[in-house]
């Protein structure tokens, strides 16, 4: 038996969905159940191995849709600038280093290569852009070998992506993706798939699912139909990660489902089980399905996280210390918290605020800190394991107006902040 967990993407600032998957992965490992975590998105900025390891997954746990049809393994990047230099067929006349970007110039050919490093100061290259006569013509993406290449042509003075080519370990071509804006055609040696939906359907059909396997759908946007149609004879489960309906739109005769679950709920007769995080949500869903639909779904409760033990500070908590931990995303409103602490500083000069997490709002928070000259008492701490960190603080702040489950708040409840 294998449990396949279907998701879209994963990032450095992952959501509760990925944390729930990571918790589930730990449970599967502890109980000896074979599980795979499938990611359907294209990853261009980072190596999936790095992102997954950051969440606690092992490389062998991961299946990436786009590499499944190659013989490449999920693995960290080991390709270096020196490796790149050996492969460039021209004389390198100049080198420039600017942060995470190393540029190698070939003056005679009017070509330069921009190597994007995994981390500043390292020699590990994630991708390389080739620019000829001022025009981007190619991007190569690496792990322990070249994974795939993007090809570009200039259109209206902009680089236009028209093709991706995916490689095997020996450099042979596994398949091509022909790109036309948001549409793609996938070309294999023995078949052509005319959309990503067909690509996903083909992938599902190649898993060799049996009646002993389970497919758990964590996110369904753009994938739901293909997964639903190609899961049998395996069992299909759907995870409800958030509030599943709009309370303000409920009447005696109608209900407005959360759009992320509408397809799954409308096809509930094809779902073997739904998973909620709490018994309360399970009870509400059962009542609503009974009232508004002809379906009688099987719904089980599996929490998306747990706390293994009570943790108390070994000494005194840091005086006037404040902590928050979340994705640095707009809906978390960490900027409100930073501004509130700046205001509190006026009457409480000893206050100290540590912000844990990463995300799109990081630059905005840095600007707030700098504008208020708050560098001495507001600190961005990045993504860290906070298991033994929470207990040292006196106060936890949250600016989020809604939570699907609130893993952080669960952790805090046993630390007595």
Where are these regions (language model features)?
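Membrane-proximal helix-turn-helix segments that form the acceptor-binding/catalytic region
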Residues: 203-209, 243, 252-274
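Short glycine/serine-rich donor-binding loops of glycosyltransferases
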Residues: 406-409
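A short, active-site helix/loop in glycosyltransferases that binds the activated sugar's phosphate group
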Residues: 261, 268-297
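Conserved small/polar residues in nucleotide/adenosyl-binding loops
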Residues: 415-417
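Aromatic "clamp/platform" in nucleotide-sugar-dependent glycosyltransferases that forms part
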Residues: 401
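A conserved mid-protein helix/loop that constitutes part of the nucleotide-sugar donor-binding site
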Residues: 320, 324-343, 360-366
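Nucleotide-activated donor-binding/catalytic signature segment of Leloir-type glycosyltransferases, i.e.
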Residues: 364-383
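Short alpha-helical donor nucleotide-sugar binding micro-motif in glycosyltransferases
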Residues: 383-384, 388-393, 398
């Amino acid at each position: 038996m294998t449990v396949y967990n279907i998701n879209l993407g994963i990032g450095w600032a992952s959501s509760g969905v990925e944390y729930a998957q990571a918790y589930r992965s730990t449970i599967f490992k502890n109980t000896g159940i074979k599980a795979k975590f499938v990611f359907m998105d294209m990853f261009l900025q980072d190596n999936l191995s790095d992102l997954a390891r950051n969440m606690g997954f092992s490389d062998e746990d991961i299946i990436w849709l786009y590499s499944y049809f190659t013989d490449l393994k999920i693995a960290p990047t080991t390709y270096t600038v020196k490796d790149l230099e050996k492969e460039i067929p021209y004389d390198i006349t100049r080198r420039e280093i600017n942060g995470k970007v190393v540029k190698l110039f070939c003056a005679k050919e009017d070509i330069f290569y921009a190597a994007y490093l995994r981390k500043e100061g390292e020699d590990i290259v994630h991708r390389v852009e080739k620019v000829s006569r001022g025009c981007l013509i190619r991007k190569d993406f690496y792990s322990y070998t070249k994974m795939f290449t993007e090809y570009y042509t200039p259109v209206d003075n902009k680089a236009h992506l028209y093709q991706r080519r995916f490689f095997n370990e020996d450099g042979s071509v596994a398949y091509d993706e022909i790109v036309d804006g948001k549409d793609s055609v996938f070309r294999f040696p023995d078949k052509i798939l005319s959309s990503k939906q067909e690509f996903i359907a083909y992938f599902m059909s190649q898993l060799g699912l049996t009646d002993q396997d389970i497919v758990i759908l964590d996110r369904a946007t753009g994938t739901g139909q293909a997964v639903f149609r190609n899961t049998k004879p395996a069992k299909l489960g759907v995870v409800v990660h958030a509030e599943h309906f709009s309370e303000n739109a409920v009447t005696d005769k109608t209900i407005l489902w959360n759009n992320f679950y509408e397809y799954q709920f409308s096809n509930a007769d094809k779902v073997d089980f739904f998973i909620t995080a709490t018994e309360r949500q399970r009870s509400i869903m059962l009542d609503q399905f009974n009232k508004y639909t002809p379906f009688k779904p099987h719904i089980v409760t599996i929490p998306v996280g747990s706390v293994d033990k009570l943790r108390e500070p070994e000494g005194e908590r840091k005086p006037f210390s404040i902590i928050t931990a979340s994705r640095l995303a707009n809906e978390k409103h960490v900027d409100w918290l930073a501004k509130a602490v700046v205001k509190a500083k006026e009457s409480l000069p000893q206050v100290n605020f540590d912000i844990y997490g990463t995300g799109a709002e990081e630059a905005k928070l840095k600007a707030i800190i700098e504008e208020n000259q708050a560098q001495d008492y507001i600190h961005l701490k990045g993504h860290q394991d906070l298991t033994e960190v929470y207990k040292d603080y006196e106060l936890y702040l949250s600016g989020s107006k809604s939570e699907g489950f609130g893993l952080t708040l669960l952790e805090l409840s046993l630390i007595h902040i």
